[in-house]
Regions:
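Conserved ABC ATPase "signature" region
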Residues: 56, 60, 67-85
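Conserved catalytic motifs of ABC-family nucleotide-binding domains
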Residues: 110
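Conserved ABC ATPase signature
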Residues: 89-96
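Conserved ABC transporter NBD signature motif
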Residues: 19-32
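Helix-to-loop junction immediately C-terminal to a conserved catalytic motif
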Residues: 11
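ABC transporter nucleotide-binding domain
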Residues: 130-223
Length: 265
């Protein structure tokens, strides 16, 4: 799609064929490297180096002061549950552990701009939550987070604003809240009081495109010209239900719709 390529251009690893990029007021990231943290998609630890030595090396590249660097390394290793690996070689760590070490390397200089390319790769659910909390913390402390992922659910959990790229072109750029309002789901989910109820009453409604069983629930898809809020009472009146709710459109739904329609949103 172009996500990682865009990040590499921001970081001056690659250079654009035309146009220009500005990062924190500079045309290249190199001029602002001490203010940027970058977690690449690929593993970037030096396998033969010990963890503390590797982090110290990265900190010095980012001009972290000698009086602060060891303190920050110790604090961060404790925070991610790796206090006992400081003297181990990076190659001795699991994939998930290496990912957490790379995250520490990205935030060691307390960056203003934190660029994360698939940061949850290799992490189990517990460590994914830990890393997500740490990312939120960086944002609360004033950092701008550029988060790249192909997993839409992760973007919904982390981001306030979404940019979607398809075939190298931007097809969506808006706040998560605005996207949710503009791409409202046309699907309702109801739980009939009688699980064996005949769906003919729903199919007969002119506002309904189709009704389908999903276990004890029924998924109702409204026609495109019907407001979702207007569909709720219609469904509830047609079939006695214990509950009826609007199914929220996910970012994955939005992306698929945009790609299938072949237009920017």
């Amino acid at each position: 799609a172009g996500k990682t390529t865009t990040i590499r251009m921001i970081m001056a690893i690659l250079f654009p064929d035309r146009g220009e990029l500005r990062v924190l007021g500079h045309r290249q990231a190199l001029a602002a490297k001490d203010r940027i943290g970058y977690l690449p998609e690929e593993r970037g630890v030096y396998r033969k180096m010990k963890v503390a030595a590797f982090l110290r090396f990265v900190g010095r590249l980012k001009n972290v002061g000698e009086d602060a660097i060891d303190r920050r390394i110790t604090t961060w290793l404790e925070r991610v549950g790796l206090a006992d690996v400081a003297s181990k070689k990076c190659e001795e760590l699991s994939k998930g552990m290496q990912q957490k070490i790379q995250f520490i390397a990205a935030v060691l200089n307390e960056p203003e701009l934190l660029i994360l390319d698939e940061p949850f790769s290799g992490l189990d659910p517990v460590n994914m939550r830990l890393l997500r909390d740490l990312i939120d913390e960086q944002h609360r402390h004033g950092a701008t987070i550029l988060f790249s992922t192909h997993v839409m659910a992760q973007a919904e959990q982390v981001c306030e604003r979404i940019v979607m790229i398809h075939d190298g072109r931007k097809v969506l750029d808006d706040s998560l809240a605005a996207i949710g309002q503009r791409h409202a789901s046309r699907q309702l989910v109801c739980e009939p009081l009688d699980p064996a109820v005949d769906l003919a009453a729903l199919d007969a409604l002119p506002q309904v495109a189709r009704a389908e069983r999903e276990g004890v629930r029924v998924r109702v898809t409204l026609r495109d010209d019907v407001e979702p809020a207007a569909g709720l009472p219609l469904v509830a009146c047609a079939v006695p239900c214990a509950s009826v709710e609007l199914q929220r459109a996910t970012l994955e739904d939005v992306f698929v719709d945009i790609v299938q329609e072949g237009r920017p949103a």
